[in-house]
Design a protein with these regions (language model features):
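Recognition helix of helix-turn-helix/homeodomain-like DNA-binding domains
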Residues: 26-46, 67-70
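Short, charge-rich amphipathic alpha-helical segments embedded
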Residues: 145-158
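Long, hydrophobic alpha-helical segments
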Residues: 47-51
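Short basic helix-loop element that most often maps to the first helix and adjoining turn
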Residues: 4-26
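Charged, helix-prone or intrinsically disordered regulatory segments positioned adjacent to compact structured domains
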Residues: 52-131, 160-162
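Short, charged, amphipathic alpha-helical segments
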Residues: 134-142
């Protein structure tokens, strides 16, 4: 999914218009919506400073906006192949279902990814058990790794996200 699609997704999630978001970022009122439309459609790509400003206004991590190319199934497959090469991601089958798992023996990066995925699973389990709301879960995901308690420099999460 391209950065423009992520901007669009989070803008709608926050109930903002293109004009409002553009003006909040400092674009002139006359062209704010056009400028945002250019970023959302991919005809323009925001530089790092604008990506950081967008993330701040949209209340997400800049990492939530910048994701690999998963716009097509082929792009997604190559992303998974790269994860296999670099992080020990393995595909298997269990009870007729496709499963992805991390081979922690591959290298220290694979072990770290395994820890991060385990933390994600813990948050998902809290959501499934009703211990946290969908909003709290989404806040954890969209601000990752800010509220990840397994990270050394993690900030204190909102109530319920521990």
């Amino acid at each position: 999914m391209a950065i423009g699609e992520r901007i669009h997704f989070f803008r709608l999630l926050r109930g903002m218009t293109q004009k409002y978001l553009g003006m909040t970022l400092g674009f002139p009122e006359k062209s704010a919506d056009v400028r945002l439309a250019q970023y959302e459609t991919g005809s323009r790509t925001p530089k790092a400073d604008l990506t950081a400003a967008l993330a701040e206004v949209l209340d997400v991590s800049p990492h939530a906006l910048s994701v690999p190319d998963i716009d097509s199934y082929v792009g997604l497959m190559h992303t998974l192949f790269t994860l296999e090469d670099n992080y020990g991601l393995k595909i298997s089958e269990m009870d007729g279902e496709i499963c992805l798992k991390v081979d922690v023996r591959k290298n220290k990066d694979a072990a770290r990814l395994h820890e991060m995925l385990w933390t994600w699973r813990e948050q998902a389990a809290k959501l499934e058990a009703g211990e946290i709301s969908q909003e709290e879960y989404d806040r954890w995901r969209y601000h990752y790794p800010e509220y990840d308690s397994s990270q050394i420099r993690a900030k204190m999460p909102p109530e319920g996200l521990i």
